[in-house]
Amino acid sequence: QDLPGTDNSTATLCLGHHAVPNGTIVKTITDDQIEVTNATELVQSSSTGKICNNPHRILDGRDCTLIDALLGDPHCDVFQDETWDLFVERSNAFSNCYPYDVPDYASLRSLVASSGTLEFITEGFTWTGVTQNGGSNACKRGPANGFFSRLNWLTKSGSTYPVLNVTMPNNDNFDKLYIWGVHHPSTNQEQTNLYVQASGRVTVSTRRSQQTIIPNIGSRPWVRGQSGRISIYWTIVKPGDVLVINSNGNLIAPRGYFKMRTGKSSIMRSDALIDTCVSECITPNGSIPNDKPFQNVNKITYGACPKYVKQNTLKLAIGMRNVPEKQTRGLFGAIAGFIENGWEGMIDGWYGFRHQNSEGTGQAADLKSTQAAIDQINGKLNRVIEKTNEKFHQIEKEFSEVEGRIQDLEKYVEDTKIDLWSYNADVLVALENQHTIDLTDSEMNKLFEKTRRQLRENAEDMGNGCFKIYHKCDNACIESIRNGTYDHDIYRDEALNNRFQIKGVELKSGYKDWILWISFAISCFLLCVVLLGFIMWACQRGNIRCNICI
């Protein structure tokens, strides 16, 4: 007898999700390696190789350092009164004036860089009894001897160098940066030739601070024909405060002040080409896109940049769990649902239906559940970026040799921060991936339960993501199930009748197996009884003797 399931009286409807032949491996909280249909890379690992000049204003230092431009080295005059968002120092920068040192070089460099301007205001300092505008053949401005344009080298006038005592109040409403210096002659003879006194002294003070410097006379390595040195110092004068300069020799006086500004300007060492392009994030390697939450290009950044992490790759799942389709099955050779495997080739949705009925086979996507999953996943990348991208800049840290312990501590702190962010990134991505897989599985289960509630007793769950429908269900009927308009009452009687017929035939077919097993058991029992009876009869006749030994 033919099963009713093989004629036009039944149909099969399977639910499933799409799959791809080769998925992407991602990490979740519970599994280090799980395959998904699609994932996006979260770590930016390469730069453009060039620094973009938009939207940030980039100032190329060329062959000048920021401090040389600040002091007014003759070959850096082009930078007078310049402004910037990011000052780019080049490795080929050099000084071309009187040799100098800055005891607090890193702090001054950082202070000026963050101000973002070299705007200079000349003030009328009165230096009585001394010669101004000293120069050196180590600092040529054209053919003549020159000096730093923002500093005034004071020497003796005739045979005297009086004690200088000059005050300059700050009557403005902004901070003023004064740059000054102390000259260290190479010999005692040079000291008296320039300043008369055998030992000079320079004191610069405000209401908040005071610095007193005694020159160190002695020969040093020759630089540009000079064995003397100048030490550069700086003082900030707040609004309402007063700058007081007292000296009896060796003073390199200020000519005015730099107007200090507050902002997020910075400085970076880089040899990357500056080009006309747009990029929010800049590293010494060049600009990088900021459409990813993490980067491992460089620790030093400027602008709205991804967080630096140690990982070379972090994959964010933007698709569901991937279970490739068993290729030996064929498209409908043995129709199966999502519990067994995914479906390849379903390009118009993530979830869908496959059916087999009297009109043949077919497939259609379920757009509603697909859209529900996509809506929840779409914002993930933006949310991760929002959690990690900040408008900040990680400047370079510089320390003198005597600050080695501070430098070691700073390096330890920075390395610890990177370790923490690398760990946080790993956990954050794993959590998001776990959530993505859980919600896509949930949408599949919701669609399956929705279909089950529609079919009720008109169909049977086959246990593999498919339903056996016990009534004739043409393509219009299948479509009503997909769009949620299916009325199970219309087909209930037919489904019950077909179900009983099919179950009855299955039951009758099952009796044959039971009868065979029962017949075999009875035959074995009768054979044992006959054999036992024969043995007992033979013993009574004496044909068989049985001895029992203890």
UniProtKB/Swiss-Prot annotation:
Note: Major glycoprotein, comprises over 80% of the envelope proteins present in virus particle. The extent of infection into host organism is determined by HA. Influenza viruses bud from the apical surface of polarized epithelial cells (e.g. bronchial epithelial cells) into lumen of lungs and are therefore usually pneumotropic. The reason is that HA is cleaved by tryptase clara which is restricted to lungs. However, HAs of H5 and H7 pantropic avian viruses subtypes can be cleaved by furin and subtilisin-type enzymes, allowing the virus to grow in other organs than lungs.
Name used for this protein in its record: Hemagglutinin
Job of this protein: Binds to sialic acid-containing receptors on the cell surface, bringing about the attachment of the virus particle to the cell. This attachment induces virion internalization either through clathrin-dependent endocytosis or through clathrin- and caveolin-independent pathway. Plays a major role in the determination of host range restriction and virulence. Class I viral fusion protein. Responsible for penetration of the virus into the cell cytoplasm by mediating the fusion of the membrane of the endocytosed virus particle with the endosomal membrane.
Subunit: Homotrimer of disulfide-linked HA1-HA2.
Annotated site location: Cleavage: 329-330
Database matches in InterPro entries: Capsid_hemagglutn, Hemagglutn_HA1_a/b_dom_sf, Hemagglutn_influenz_A, Hemagglutn_influenz_A/B
Spans through the membrane: 515-535
Glycosylation site positions: 8, 22, 38, 165, 285, 483
Subcellular location field: Virion membrane; Host apical cell membrane
